[in-house]
């Protein structure tokens, strides 16, 4: 037998293994075993690893994008876009050395005492008028708080003696005011002189003016009941529609209520502005429409009432519109988000319309004059100078569109005084008047444009030979005239009142007759949105012809606006009679029994005008205001020598000579 094999040698070990249980028993069961992540990863197939890497990369990308979105939201919530913050820092005034009894302050006191003797307050009784930076606890602006902090001890030292100042019926104690002393002078006393200049206590309303007041109250009843604080009333469905969400109708009607002497209604509207009008909203607004309606409405109401609340709101809103001017060409974008400061062109084009970019100058210039912030005026005047220097015009006539990137006219060869170009011509004249007739470039452009209209756009209809303004497209004339063009006779008459050639008045009279006939020849007595004129003798045709798509009426003001100017300049009472006829037609065919007035679809059907269920803000902001002024026996009520109306009928003062 063989001996049993020897056991194998023990394995060589050159280390010692030590196990520390730390009071726990060692467990080597499967439930306790763990493999390293790397070993697990290596055991996965290539496909599995690629899928996991893709998912991780996707999640990281989503997290990065979310962080950017969150940062933008915080930026919006901060209250100012970066561009606006930069602008505010640049214009923050330096605190002057305190002077208790300077000659300038004594002069302001003299002005106050003199104006109190002559001024009769009109408006809501017992209005508590606050300084610009103390509108309400919730509504105090950021720049007001900064100015408050900047005052510090200087204001406390200056207000050791309590002095009571009576200002337009309100009692203001200096230690309660938060603005700088020189700012009080600029924002309160100086504009108060202007307010007393453009507004004088009128005579009691006559019968026709009472008719306008009744119409306004009926419109306002519908707005109060069904659309209070919203943009526009839908009177038939008894609800509202929103455009900007900023109480557009209410702001547009503020100065109308003041002019009509509706104290209680004005007081209620002012309360809404003080407590509810907040511009820190993530909403896009159209630069042109919001400027002429909101900024213009606030500025004019400030001048009429002397209430600094409206100037504070106007300054805040103006700053929020400024990012629209940050384009390569300085031609502003059409839209701007007033909460984030993001400005842009419409989605379908990079163009702005010429009327939009050249019909905001009156408002921004006046805002600069009141606040001392030059950027407002500089931005809009740069646009005016740029348009002046451009080629592509035809004897003073301008195309309808301009590119915000290149700063050049687009769609050349098309000329109209209707939509997209109309108020360019209006604001040439009105800026010249506003500035005290010193800016000759504006006057030259206006006069040249009127000559261009005569040469290229004027024709006469058949059979009554009505003079009308048509359109020109690449050398081809179209006998089409928007109701918007009916602003022109009034603008021509205004120019004659301020010394322009007398033949402008002849054209104004002729065009006024045409605009009246655009109303008179319709079965409802109301003008269509667009009219076409018959240029050839036909026994069975009227002068004014209307296509089915153009026969609606939006309660527009242009005809009664021009009637107001023609009556002021000529004092011919037929213009008052024509306006009264139009008011009666509004009452008969557009009035909604429950409150409000509605635009209509068919001015040619007196039996079924078909309400469109919308009352535009300009009906109470412009149409009824111009009718009230037209019927006034007092030609000094908002005199054409002391104020100029913006294109939304908001009166602004003519600047006194320096």
UniProtKB/Swiss-Prot annotation:
ATP-binding listed as a keyword: no
Active-site residues, record numbering mapped to chain: 289 (proton donor), 422, 529 (proton donor), 558
One Pfam family it belongs to: Glyco_hydro_47
Cystines in this chain: 486-515
Biological role: Involved in glycoprotein quality control targeting of misfolded glycoproteins for degradation. It primarily trims a single alpha-1,2-linked mannose residue from Man(9)GlcNAc(2) to produce Man(8)GlcNAc(2), but at high enzyme concentrations, as found in the ER quality control compartment (ERQC), it further trims the carbohydrates to Man(5-6)GlcNAc(2).
Topological domains, Lumenal: 72-658
Main location: endoplasmic reticulum
Xref: SUPFAM superfamilies: Seven-hairpin glycosidases (SSF48225)
Family designation: Belongs to the glycosyl hydrolase 47 family.
Binding site for Ca(2+): 647
Keyword Membrane appears in the UniProt entry: yes
Classification via Gene3D superfamilies: 1.50.10.10
Major enzyme class: hydrolase
GO biological process, one term: mannoprotein catabolic process
Name listed for the protein in its UniProt record: Endoplasmic reticulum mannosyl-oligosaccharide 1,2-alpha-mannosidase
Compartment(s) of residence: Endoplasmic reticulum membrane
Bilayer topology: Single-pass type II membrane protein
Entry-annotated residues carrying Phosphoserine: 102
An annotated Gene Ontology molecular function: mannosyl-oligosaccharide 1,2-alpha-mannosidase activity
Record keywords, A-Z: Calcium, Disulfide bond, Endoplasmic reticulum, Glycosidase, Hydrolase, Membrane, Metal-binding, Phosphoprotein, Signal-anchor, Transmembrane, Transmembrane helix
EC number: 3.2.1.113
Pathway terms, separated by semicolons: Protein modification; protein glycosylation
UniProt organism field: Mus musculus (Mouse)
Reactions the enzyme catalyzes: N(4)-(alpha-D-Man-(1->2)-alpha-D-Man-(1->2)-alpha-D-Man-(1->3)-[alpha-D-Man-(1->2)-alpha-D-Man-(1->3)-[alpha-D-Man-(1->2)-alpha-D-Man-(1->6)]-alpha-D-Man-(1->6)]-beta-D-Man-(1->4)-beta-D-GlcNAc-(1->4)-beta-D-GlcNAc)-L-asparaginyl-[protein] (N-glucan mannose isomer 9A1,2,3B1,2,3) + 4 H2O = N(4)-(alpha-D-Man-(1->3)-[alpha-D-Man-(1->3)-[alpha-D-Man-(1->6)]-alpha-D-Man-(1->6)]-beta-D-Man-(1->4)-beta-D-GlcNAc-(1->4)-beta-D-GlcNAc)-L-asparaginyl-[protein] (N-glucan mannose isomer 5A1,2) + 4 beta-D-mannose; N(4)-(alpha-D-Man-(1->2)-alpha-D-Man-(1->2)-alpha-D-Man-(1->3)-[alpha-D-Man-(1->3)-[alpha-D-Man-(1->2)-alpha-D-Man-(1->6)]-alpha-D-Man-(1->6)]-beta-D-Man-(1->4)-beta-D-GlcNAc-(1->4)-beta-D-GlcNAc)-L-asparaginyl-[protein] (N-glucan mannose isomer 8A1,2,3B1,3) + 3 H2O = N(4)-(alpha-D-Man-(1->3)-[alpha-D-Man-(1->3)-[alpha-D-Man-(1->6)]-alpha-D-Man-(1->6)]-beta-D-Man-(1->4)-beta-D-GlcNAc-(1->4)-beta-D-GlcNAc)-L-asparaginyl-[protein] (N-glucan mannose isomer 5A1,2) + 3 beta-D-mannose
């Amino acid at each position: 037998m063989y001996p049993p094999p020897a056991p194998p040698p023990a394995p060589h070990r050159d280390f010692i293994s030590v196990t520390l249980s730390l009071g726990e028993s060692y467990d080597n069961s499967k439930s306790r075993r763990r493999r390293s992540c790397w070993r697990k990863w290596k055991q996965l197939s290539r496909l599995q690893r690629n899928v996991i890497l893709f998912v991780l990369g996707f999640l990281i990308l989503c997290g990065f994008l979310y962080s950017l979105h969150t940062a933008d939201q915080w930026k919006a919530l901060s209250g100012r876009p970066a561009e606006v913050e930069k602008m505010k820092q640049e214009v923050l005034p330096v605190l002057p050395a305190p002077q208790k009894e300077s000659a300038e302050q004594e002069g302001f006191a003299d002005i106050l005492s003199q104006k109190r003797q002559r001024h009769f307050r009109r408006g809501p009784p017992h209005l508590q008028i606050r300084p610009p930076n103390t509108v309400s606890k919730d509504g105090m602006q950021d720049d007001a708080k900064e100015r408050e902090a900047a005052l510090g001890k200087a204001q406390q030292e200056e207000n050791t003696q309590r002095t009571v100042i009576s200002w337009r019926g309100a009692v203001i104690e200096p230690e309660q005011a938060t603005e700088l002393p020189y700012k009080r002078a600029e924002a309160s006393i100086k504009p108060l002189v202007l307010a007393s200049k453009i507004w004088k206590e009128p005579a009691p309303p006559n019968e026709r003016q009472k008719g306008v007041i009744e119409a306004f109250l009926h419109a306002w009843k519908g707005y109060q009941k069904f659309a209070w604080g919203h943009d526009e009333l839908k009177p038939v469905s008894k609800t509202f529609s929103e455009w900007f969400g900023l109480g557009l109708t209410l702001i547009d009607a503020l100065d109308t209520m003041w002019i009509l002497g509706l104290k209680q209604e004005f007081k209620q509207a002012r309360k809404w502005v003080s407590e509810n009008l907040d511009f820190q909203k993530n909403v896009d607004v159209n630069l042109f429409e919001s400027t002429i309606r909101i900024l213009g409405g606030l500025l004019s109401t400030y001048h009429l009432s002397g209430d600094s609340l409206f100037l504070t709101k106007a300054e805040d809103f103006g700053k929020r519109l400024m990012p629209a001017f940050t384009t390569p060409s300085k031609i502003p974008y059409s839209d701007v988000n007033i909460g984030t400061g993001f400005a842009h062109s419409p989605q379908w084009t990079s163009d702005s319309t010429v009327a939009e970019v050249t019909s905001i100058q009156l408002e921004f210039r006046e805002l600069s004059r009141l606040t001392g912030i030059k950027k407002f005026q500089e931005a809009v005047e740069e646009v005016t100078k740029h348009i002046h220097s451009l080629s592509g015009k035809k004897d003073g006539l301008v195309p309808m569109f301009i590119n915000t990137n290149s700063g050049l006219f687009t769609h050349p060869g098309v000329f109209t005084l209707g939509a997209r170009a109309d108020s360019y011509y209006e604001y040439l004249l009105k800026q010249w008047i506003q500035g005290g007739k010193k800016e000759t470039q504006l006057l030259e452009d206006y006069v040249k444009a009127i000559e261009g209209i005569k040469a290229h756009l004027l024709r006469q209809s058949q059979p009554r030979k009505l003079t009308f303004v048509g359109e020109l497209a690449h050398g081809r004339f179209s006998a089409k005239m928007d109701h918007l063009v009916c602003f022109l006779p009034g603008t021509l008459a205004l120019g004659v009142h301020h010394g322009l050639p007398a033949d402008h008045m002849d054209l104004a009279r002729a065009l006024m007759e045409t605009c009246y006939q655009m109303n008179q020849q319709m079965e409802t007595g109301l003008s269509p949105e667009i009219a076409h004129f018959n240029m050839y003798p036909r026994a069975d045709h009227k002068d004014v012809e209307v296509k089915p798509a153009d026969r609606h009426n939006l309660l527009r003001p242009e005809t009664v606006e021009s009637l107001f100017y023609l009556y002021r300049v000529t004092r011919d009472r037929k213009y008052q009679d024509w306006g009264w006829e139009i008011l009666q037609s509004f009452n008969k065919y557009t009035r909604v029994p429950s409150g409000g007035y509605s635009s209509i679809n068919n001015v040619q059907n007196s039996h079924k005008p078909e309400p469109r269920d919308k009352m535009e803000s300009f009906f109470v902001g412009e149409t009824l205001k111009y009718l009230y002024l037209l019927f006034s026996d007092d030609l000094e009520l908002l005199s054409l020598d002391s104020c100029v109306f913006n294109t939304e009928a908001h009166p602004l003062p003519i600047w006194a000579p320096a």
